[in-house]
Regions:
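An internal, D/E-rich "acidic patch" concept
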Residues: 59-115
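Hydrophobic alpha-helical segments embedded in or immediately adjacent to the lipid bilayer
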Residues: 116, 120, 129-179
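N-terminal signal-anchor/first transmembrane alpha helix
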Residues: 1-59, 89, 93, 116, ...
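Alpha-helical transmembrane segments of integral membrane proteins
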Residues: 2-5, 17-20, 96-129, 176-335
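Hydrophobic alpha-helical transmembrane segments of membrane transport/permease proteins
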Residues: 17-67, 156-194
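Residue-level signal for discrete positions within transmembrane alpha-helices
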Residues: 13, 95, 99, 107, ...
Length: 335
């Protein structure tokens, strides 16, 4: 991607982030509730309450509060969590690896499953199997994530307890890791039993998150492949004697991958946002669960930091998808 093409996107990203900061700052202060009231003891004096509000800068006018927060963000700090008494950025970075590993695992499942059902539906187009796949796709899209999650908990965690339904790993396993990237560091250090335990804890929440995304990928990829299958070069490939499987994989799938890739990148950002409910259901210690904790405790700095993190991630993923799409499509690459 050229500098001339990249610069407007960077400016647009900066303006978008500024807008996100303003909106979240206003919204968290419009919602009823006082974070200080949730911290103080019933017998606290008005002087103690005033001192606590001054400590967190909540006694300042709103424009000054925003200016302080904006200045902190520019210097790489999101402030101090009111409820946890820790640096907000530190708290987020401790939880972010768990969510990223879960999201990438769910994305991998969605891509594999979505591609499989798209290939199967395209290969058997016009048959009863295609109708069954389309109906199942509609079911995966229609049922909310939390219903899938509760169903998995009931079936595979209670009735047939074959998989763990809460947490990120077995507390009895001490892998002595230095980072929160359990899978990556576990593989690098050869702790394969620990990695397998982490994956087992991720299967149910990842399945819950991947179902709607797999349905979307499968539907878009199938439609794109159907358009490709009527092109002249597909007919030429058939005349040359290429098998249907080879035509599907080498011609149809490859040429239909660009729109599916762009959609996958956009949906991945919503996948990160969808971790809020899923992590709560499975007691998974990621930033989704942290977001609910922040809202319940009216932790304004933590809420602001989390929303800004989500916004930044959304922008970065979309820029990465644009760059990858341009790389795969020469017409966009030289635009």
């Amino acid at each position: 991607m050229s500098i001339a093409r990249l610069l407007p996107r960077l400016i647009s990203a900066a303006v978008t982030l500024l807008g996100v900061m303003v909106i979240v700052f206003v919204l968290v202060r419009v919602v009823p509730g006082d974070p200080i009231a949730m911290m103080i003891s019933p017998g606290a004096s008005p002087a103690d309450i005033a001192a606590l509000r001054a400590h967190y800068g909540l006694d300042l006018p709103l424009y000054q509060q925003f200016a302080v927060w904006f200045w902190q963000v520019l210097h790489g700090s999101f402030g101090t969590s009111i409820s946890l008494k820790q640096n907000v950025l530190t708290v987020i970075l401790q939880r972010l690896p768990a969510t990223l590993e879960l999201a990438f695992f769910a994305l991998g499942l969605a891509v594999v499953w979505g591609t499989f059902i798209a290939l199967l539906s395209t290969a058997w187009r016009g048959t009863m199997l295609e109708k069954l796949i389309d109906n199942f796709n509609g079911l995966m899209l229609a049922v909310p994530d939390f219903i899938w999650g509760l169903t998995f908990v009931l079936l595979l965690g209670v009735l047939l307890p074959v998989l763990p339904v809460s947490g990120r790993s077995d507390p009895a396993i001490d892998a002595k890791l230095f980072t929160q990237f359990y899978i990556v560091e576990g593989l690098l250090r050869g702790h394969f039993y620990f990695v397998w335990d982490v994956l087992k804890h991720m299967i149910l929440p990842a399945l819950t998150m991947s179902f709607p995304l797999a349905a979307v990928i499968g539907r878009v990829l199938k439609n794109a492949m159907m358009d490709v299958m009527v092109q002249d070069y597909i007919l030429l490939a058939r005349i040359k004697g290429l098998s249907n499987l080879r035509i599907l994989l080498q011609e149809a799938l490859r040429n239909a991958a660009v729109p599916a890739l762009a959609l996958t990148g956009v949906q991945f950002t919503f996948l990160i946002g969808g971790t809020v409910i899923t992590e709560r259901i499975f007691s998974y210690p990621g930033i989704g669960n942290l977001a609910i904790y922040a809202v319940i405790n009216r932790d304004l700095p933590l809420i602001q930091g989390l929303v800004l993190t989500f916004g930044t991630f959304f922008i970065l993923v979309n820029m990465a998808v644009d760059a990858m799409t341009a790389w795969l499509n020469p017409r966009l690459r030289h635009a």
